[in-house]
Amino acid sequence: MSKTNARKPIYKSLYVQVLAAVTIGVLLGHFSPELGAQMKPLGDGFIKLIKMIIAPIIFCTVVIGIAGMEDMKKVGKTGGLALLYFEVMSTLALVIGLIVVNVLQPGSGMHIDPASLDTKSIAAYTAPGKMQGTVDFLLNVIPTSVVDAFAKGEILQVLLFSVLFGFALHRFGGRGTMVFDFIEKFSHVLFDIVGIIMKVAPIGAFGAMAFTIGKYGLGSLFSLGKLMGAFYLTCLIFVFVVLGIVSRLHGFSVFKFVRYIKEELLIVLGTSSSESVLPRMMEKLENLGARKSVVGLVIPTGYSFNLDGTSIYLTMAAVFIAQATDTPMSLTQQITLLAVLMLTSKGAAGITGSGFIVLAATLSAVGGVPVAGLALILGIDRFMSEARALTNLVGNGVATLVVAKWTGDLDMQRLHQGLDQPSLQESQEPEVILDQQVAHMAVAKSHG
């Protein structure tokens, strides 16, 4: 066995390091809450490091993918199929959440009087003007300036500019070769930076978890444990049953895929942010044989439109509040709730605290269910956000592979090789694997 493929000692595995860091963070937050709460800057710092690199990585990936394509019609086809998939799956997630919360009824028997709830804590989420309309949302996709889009890290704005830049570079043909080569080399530097940042992922996961447990405590988990259990169960059903069926129909196993991205899942568990692994997910999906142009379009768009975990949360939280406050909801009202959420969940994409903003706007629009009931779930929202982020991450990964297969841009041999031999993949950093693949392609091209 070559040195490159030699398996690393277990203590050097990022998976083991993050798992240990999360465990230590939980213990510190539980036994020393005050000290645990002070660890917040460690988690925030790691997420900021990742966000620093997301916009340029999306730009390079999308531009290289589009400018290197022979058929420009494929870009529009890929985008259209991705949006169709997102709409179907997010609607399915809303429906499943609605069914499970009606069957398990986690809020039944609580008999909460809405007038007795402290609404000051939710004022920031229910203030007028927080919720975007459809027109405002679409206009917000267009940046005021390119610099502004990159400076603020607005994913959809960066994606729009990247697509236009890729189209323009493609039209230049041979005259744009120098620019194309520069962007391609620049992307390798960016992914190397990601590799450096990921070395401190355990520190970020430790800080974020210590803060969460230190501030909110394990007690808040038990006080609303029935809702927590129902929500986590629903997310598991969605990932391993719904996405499992979708994966099987497209020739791969969701169980193997989850194992393949286990390091990313652990980092998301620790940080409660699926954005913290966006660059690394893009690399790993390319390593599985998905074309760069598909990965570059589907993943960033999915982070705004394909939030399966958030969709499950929205219907379950809304009906839970109705059950807890003894507010009857007829079938017609629940169907109306579903229809409104199909629209409002898209309008709040990318907004901080979007779960509460969407819920507040939706409950107000549907009527009947007291908005004050949001105060009930505020205390456990942080813990539920972890399940949301994990489900969103797996959902976007599966979506990318499915859309790539639909458009004929998925190398099934590489997919099965990557999923069936995880030990080989784990023995190397994704950046190393990607660089090796680029080198092989360059050699093949020179011989061709």
UniProtKB/Swiss-Prot annotation:
The keyword Transmembrane helix applies. The chain crosses the membrane at residues 13-33, 49-69, 81-101, 149-169, 193-213, 227-247, 294-314, 335-355, 357-377. It is found in: Cell inner membrane. Gene3D superfamilies: Sodium:dicarboxylate symporter. It comes from the Bacteria. The keyword Protein transport does not apply. Keywords: Cell inner membrane, Cell membrane, Membrane, Symport, Transmembrane, Transmembrane helix, Transport. It is a multi-pass membrane protein. Its main location: membrane. InterPro entries: C4_dicarb_transport, Na-dicarboxylate_symporter, Na-dicarboxylate_symporter_CS, Na:dicarbo_symporter_sf. GO terms for molecular function: fumarate transmembrane transporter activity; malate:proton symporter activity; succinate transmembrane transporter activity. GO terms for cellular component: plasma membrane. One of its GO terms (biological process) is L-aspartate transmembrane transport. NCBIfam families: PRK01663.1, PRK13027.1. Belongs to the dicarboxylate/amino acid:cation symporter (DAACS) (TC 2.A.23) family. Responsible for the transport of dicarboxylates such as succinate, fumarate, and malate from the periplasm across the membrane. PANTHER family: AEROBIC C4-DICARBOXYLATE TRANSPORT PROTEIN, PROTON/GLUTAMATE-ASPARTATE SYMPORTER. This is C4-dicarboxylate transport protein 2. It comes from Polaromonas naphthalenivorans (strain CJ2). The lineage of its organism: Bacteria, Pseudomonadati, Pseudomonadota, Betaproteobacteria, Burkholderiales.
